Amino acid sequence: MKKKNGEDRTYVLDSSAFLTMFEDEDGADVVQELLEKAKREEIIIFTSFATFAEIFYVTFRELGEKEARNRVALMNELTISRAESTKELGIIAGRLKATKRISFADAWIAATAVFYDATLVHKDPEFQQLMDKIRVIELPYKKTA
């Protein structure tokens, strides 16, 4: 959904966007700015139920259960709308998974962007193949040594 001035009004944050923010990586400022706009009700941010699971398990593996719970609790306090599994989202996610080389969780996250006609904010190379189906904001990828 777009504003009258042509700017996007609806966004979906991928797990990588949240991790960028939590770990203060390049692009964290972009995520923070979007969250501030959502708080001021200038935009709407959706986050897939799959994102909550991804944040939990990735953080659990790297930093332990306590930090995983802390991050999910913080996400629950943000001005975002959690997109739960629905029949319509399931069909869209299933179609994406069947036709693209994409993980199960990323299929749900991308389906959320398709369903809400939203711009997906991410830094996950898997989403590059979907640029004909969704609008994206690509955050800077991690630099490798």
Q: Each predicted region: which residue ranges?
A:
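Anion (oxyanion) recognition and catalysis
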Residues: 39, 76, 114
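Short, well-structured N-terminal submotif of metal-dependent ribonuclease cores
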Residues: 1-47, 60-73, 143-145
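Active-site neighborhoods of divalent-metal-dependent phosphate/nucleic-acid chemistry enzymes
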Residues: 81-121
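A generic structural signal for short hydrophobic patches within well-formed alpha-helices
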Residues: 18-19, 52, 127-128
